[in-house]
């Protein structure tokens, strides 16, 4: 007889018909809160409604219910993303010059928006070349579409409709997984299964399918486009997929099918999976065959990674075991207890994810220009500047968000009674040492970095250029950075024998790549000017970290307010009768951190914009002479504060200031309007609550006199609300001002 082990019981991991679908309930403002559902007494109600609508912690303390709401909201978010993407593709299909751009990307600018001629507004439609009049776009969509093999506006229509269908599907999924089949808490906490699906499914199969698309569709179509074939003559994507002979004409190894794969003769496939390095001289982008190879390799790694964790089969790693085994000689209990934190506090989990994703986004910003992935991206200076700026801002916001949710975790989810001598506890116990040392580093960096500039301004003002820190007087060369550049420039042949050129032209060693008489990329020299501004970067980043980290480490208690945890994540002051305890909540640290994040990112994008215009971007003559946009003035001008003001801000603002009456005039209006939005923020940041309450009561008196007083009592914004409105307008105004300044400048001169 055969003895079988008993079949493992399958766990039921969903609740059916968990919560009924009720439009009546959703139509009641504030239905998620007993207090808010009563309706407004004062105008504070509308602010609380916005503040608490998505604060699921405040609706219920049931972790399972909170998890389900977050999960469902994610589908709503995905739906909006698909809707947005669909809109972008629809604009490309309906309003753009994509097909014209595809036929001549060096002389025709990308445009996907035409302004209706209402009372002279058609002035905004500039000539982007090829007889098309519209607004020049700088989002990089045209370049992505070309890289993915889209050759007609009909294909864009089809994709737009597909994205709409997916948006509807996501909306349905969000409803279904909350109201019809809601996952149980155990499902959300099953981290090994989640890792397997995310690694092998999303990243592994996602990369594999993209590699497949690139090999079978993008590569052959781009090969034809690069050879100058008319897009209308190129076979359609399905023809390449269904007809192997068609591909074999371009890539001979296709004739052999899968035989080389199974006989391990993989080098046969080197005609479409390459390892070249550097840029394609035709398009100024990375070799698409390198990119396909990269995605195939990434897919293999993640497919393997997705099979490492123990699920139903009792084989593989358990995350709890990994964390608890992670102990160093000086770290006490090490990571013990972190597993429980990360499976019961979604704020802690989100905090880590935001920190990682924020850092990754900033890495993306730096790779988009140094290794431009799409065809004709590198010579589209407006798009290059926009992509760098966009990814820097997004990265900054995500990192501040990481600190915000770390602090919320500390206040709402941290249980000091169960934590002893693990890493988090040890960090909290020596927080004074951490913060005071970090503070010292900030003071040192601030005085020394600004001191170098002040010295240069003083020497310059006194007419003593020989005593300045510059490449031509007292040199402060960034020797470590230059060493790293040099190492990378020499790497091919030494560390990566298959590669013909280094990963990025910026390292040096190579020649410049120019497309259609414009510089795509060249080796970027670093000198004293970069050394100086680099230390400003170090200073602003350290101060941002100081503010955010102090907020997290002192979120629960401090010498000033030992019972801070009881006051919550955001509070104005420690009650009446305790002076000097305002602006100490964890929320206030996020508020202050946002301003320093804004400082830090502003210096970075200014550095990038000027450096690229001065030392990289420009035109090249038939004799091979490069003329940069600002003629290499960065090295000598940016070493004084006066130089930044005069030769960057003022000199380069001339395009936006003089844009009235031209197709760039919208940027001039935005520049003005965004300054107003920014200035408006100061009204909220500089005046106290009592001032406004007094004013309101005077206005209410006037309304009463005229018998037009509303039933809902007007109230001044609370201290926290006023700060939130202030910082929002400060950042919005500042970012929109920078956007208008950058784009008017680069579209005019680039």
Curated annotation (Swiss-Prot):
- What EC number(s) are associated with this protein in UniProt? 1.97.1.12
| Catalytic activity entry | reduced [plastocyanin] + hnu + oxidized [2Fe-2S]-[ferredoxin] = oxidized [plastocyanin] + reduced [2Fe-2S]-[ferredoxin]
Name it.
Photosystem I P700 chlorophyll a apoprotein A1
Task: List residues binding chlorophyll a'.
Answer: 675
Membrane topology classification: Multi-pass membrane protein
Q: Briefly state the protein's biological role.
A: PsaA and PsaB bind P700, the primary electron donor of photosystem I (PSI), as well as the electron acceptors A0, A1 and FX. PSI is a plastocyanin-ferredoxin oxidoreductase, converting photonic excitation into a charge separation, which transfers an electron from the donor P700 chlorophyll pair to the spectroscopically characterized acceptors A0, A1, FX, FA and FB in turn. Oxidized P700 is reduced on the lumenal side of the thylakoid membrane by plastocyanin.
Gene Ontology CC: chloroplast thylakoid membrane; photosystem I
> Which ranges does the record mark as transmembrane?
70-93, 156-179, 195-219, 291-309, 346-369, 385-411, 433-455, 531-549, 589-610, 664-686, 724-744
Fetch the NCBIfam families from UniProt: psaA (TIGR01335)
Which of this chain's residues are annotated to bind phylloquinone?
692
Give the keywords, sorted: 4Fe-4S, Chlorophyll, Chloroplast, Chromophore, Electron transport, Iron, Iron-sulfur, Magnesium, Membrane, Metal-binding, Oxidoreductase, Photosynthesis, Photosystem I, Plastid, Thylakoid, Transmembrane, Transmembrane helix, Transport
Family that this chain belongs to: Belongs to the PsaA/PsaB family.
List the PANTHER family hit by this protein, alphabetically: OUTER MEMBRANE PROTEIN, OMPA-RELATED, PHOTOSYSTEM I P700 CHLOROPHYLL A APOPROTEIN A1-RELATED
Q: How cofactor binds (record note)? A: P700 is a chlorophyll a/chlorophyll a' dimer, A0 is one or more chlorophyll a, A1 is one or both phylloquinones and FX is a shared 4Fe-4S iron-sulfur center.
Where is it localised?
Answer: Plastid, Chloroplast thylakoid membrane
Residue positions binding chlorophyll a: 683, 691
List positions binding [4Fe-4S] cluster.
573, 582
Q: Name one GO molecular function term.
A: 4 iron, 4 sulfur cluster binding
Give the quaternary structure.
The PsaA/B heterodimer binds the P700 chlorophyll special pair and subsequent electron acceptors. PSI consists of a core antenna complex that captures photons, and an electron transfer chain that converts photonic excitation into a charge separation. The eukaryotic PSI reaction center is composed of at least 11 subunits.
Source species, domain of life:
Eukaryota
Gene3D superfamilies xref list: Photosystem I PsaA/PsaB
Q: What GO biological process terms are annotated to this protein in UniProt?
A: photosynthesis
Database matches in Pfam families: PsaA_PsaB (PF00223)
């Amino acid at each position: 007889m055969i003895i079988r082990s008993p079949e493992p019981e399958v766990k039921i991991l969903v609740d059916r018909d968990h919560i009924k679908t009720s439009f009546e309930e959703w139509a009641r403002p504030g239905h998620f809160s007993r207090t808010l559902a009563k309706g407004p007494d004062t105008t504070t109600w509308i602010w609380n409604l916005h503040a608490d609508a998505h604060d699921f912690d405040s609706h219920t303390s049931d972790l399972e219910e909170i998890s389900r709401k977050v999960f469902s909201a994610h589908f709503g978010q995905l739906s909006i993303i698909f809707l947005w993407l669909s809109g972008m593709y629809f604009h490309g299909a309906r309003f753009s010059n994509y097909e014209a751009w595809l036929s001549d990307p060096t002389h025709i600018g990308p445009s996907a928006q035409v302004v209706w001629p209402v009372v002279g507004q058609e002035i905004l439609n500039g000539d982007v070349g090829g007889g098309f009049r519209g607004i020049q776009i700088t989002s990089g969509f045209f370049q992505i579409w070309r890289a993915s093999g889209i050759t007609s506006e009909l294909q864009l229509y089809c994709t737009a409709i597909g994205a709409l269908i997916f948006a509807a599907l996501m909306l349905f999924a969000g409803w279904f997984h909350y109201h019809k089949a809601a996952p149980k808490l155990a499902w959300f906490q099953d981290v090994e299964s989640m890792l397997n699906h995310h690694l092998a499914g999303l990243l592994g199969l996602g990369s594999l399918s993209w590699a497949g698309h690139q090999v079978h569709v993008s590569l052959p179509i781009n090969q034809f486009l690069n050879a100058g074939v008319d897009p209308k003559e190129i076979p359609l994507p399905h023809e390449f997929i269904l007809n192997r002979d068609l591909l074999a004409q371009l890539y001979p190894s296709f004739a052999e099918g899968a035989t080389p794969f199974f006989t391990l003769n993989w080098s046969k496939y080197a005609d479409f999976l390459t390892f070249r390095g550097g840029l394609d001289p035709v398009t100024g982008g990375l070799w698409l065959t390198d990119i396909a190879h990269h995605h195939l390799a990434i897919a293999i790694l993640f497919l393997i990674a997705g099979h490492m964790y123990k699920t139903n089969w009792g084989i593989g790693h358990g995350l709890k075991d990994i964390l608890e085994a992670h102990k160093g000689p000086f770290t006490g209990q090490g990571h013990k207890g972190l597993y429980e934190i990360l499976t019961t506090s979604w704020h802690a989990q989100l905090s880590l994810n935001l920190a990682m994703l924020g850092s990754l986004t900033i890495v993306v910003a730096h790779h988009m220009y140094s290794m431009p992935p799409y065809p004709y991206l590198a010579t589209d200076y407006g798009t290059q500047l926009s992509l760098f700026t966009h990814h820097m801002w997004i990265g900054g916001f995500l990192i501040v968000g990481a600190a915000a949710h770390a602090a919320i975790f500390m206040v709402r989810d941290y249980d000091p009674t169960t934590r002893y001598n693990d890493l988090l506890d040890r960090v909290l116990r020596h927080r004074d040492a951490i913060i005071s040392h970090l503070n010292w580093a900030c003071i040192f960096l601030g005085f020394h970095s600004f001191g170098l500039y002040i010295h240069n301004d003083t020497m310059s003002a006194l007419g003593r250029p020989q005593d300045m820190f510059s490449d031509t007087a007292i040199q402060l060369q960034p020797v470590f950075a230059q060493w790293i550049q040099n190492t990378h420039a020499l790497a091919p042949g030494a560390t990566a024998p298959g590669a013909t050129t280094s990963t990025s032209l910026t390292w040096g060693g190579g020649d410049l790549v120019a497309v259609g008489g414009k510089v795509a990329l060249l080796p970027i020299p670093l000198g004293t000017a970069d050394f100086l501004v680099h230390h400003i970067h170090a200073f602003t980043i350290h101060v941002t970290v100081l503010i955010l980290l102090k907020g997290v480490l002192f979120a629960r208690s401090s010498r000033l307010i030992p019972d801070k945890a009881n006051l919550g994540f955001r509070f104005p002051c420690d009650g009446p009768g305790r002076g000097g305890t305002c602006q100490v909540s964890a929320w206030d640290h996020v508020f202050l951190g946002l301003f320093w994040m804004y400082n830090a990112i502003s210096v970075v994008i200014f550095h990038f914009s000027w450096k690229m215009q001065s030392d990289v971007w420009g035109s090249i003559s038939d004799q091979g002479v490069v003329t940069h946009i600002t003629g290499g003035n960065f090295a000598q001008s940016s070493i004084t504060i006066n130089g930044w003001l005069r030769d960057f801000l003022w000199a380069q603002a001339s395009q936006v200031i003089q844009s009235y009456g031209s197709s760039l005039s919208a940027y001039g209006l935005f520049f003005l309007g965004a300054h107003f939005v920014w200035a408006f923020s100061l009204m909220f940041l500089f005046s106290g609550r009592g001032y406004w309450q007094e004013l309101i009561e005077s206005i209410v008196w006037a309304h009463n006199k005229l018998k037009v007083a509303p039933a809902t009592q007007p109230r001044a914004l609370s201290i926290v609300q006023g700060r939130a409105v202030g910082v929002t307008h400060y950042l919005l105004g500042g970012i929109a001002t920078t956007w208008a300044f950058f784009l008017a400048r680069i579209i005019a001169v680039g």
